[in-house]
Amino acid sequence: MIMAAGSTGERPFFEIITSIRYWIIHAVTLPAIFIAGFLFVYTGLAYDAFGTPRPDSYFQSSESKAPVVTQRYEAKSQLDLRTK
């Protein structure tokens, strides 16, 4: 087969996205990826996987606002006092 200059030998993108085979495969995989991502976040597994606190655990129940660190070099000790 003789290819045109500059051709990589791959099918043109337009030909791929207009094929029935492409849409049969992607009609299943694209919604499946979306649903998997939704469930990953909705079930809380994303919080566990990445070690992020859940929205209801950012503040302690006794606090009414976000904790503020006032001394730059004593931040660790201030946060330790907060968690006790």
UniProtKB/Swiss-Prot annotation:
It holds the Pfam family Cytochrom_B559. InterPro entries: PSII_cyt_b559_asu, PSII_cyt_b559_asu_sf, PSII_cyt_b559_N, PSII_cytb559_asu_lum. It is a single-pass membrane protein. GO terms for cellular component: photosystem II; plasma membrane-derived thylakoid membrane. It is found in: Cellular thylakoid membrane. Its cofactor is heme b. The chain crosses the membrane at residues 24-38. This is Cytochrome b559 subunit alpha. It comes from Prochlorococcus marinus (strain MIT 9301). The lineage of its organism: Bacteria, Bacillati, Cyanobacteriota, Cyanophyceae, Synechococcales.
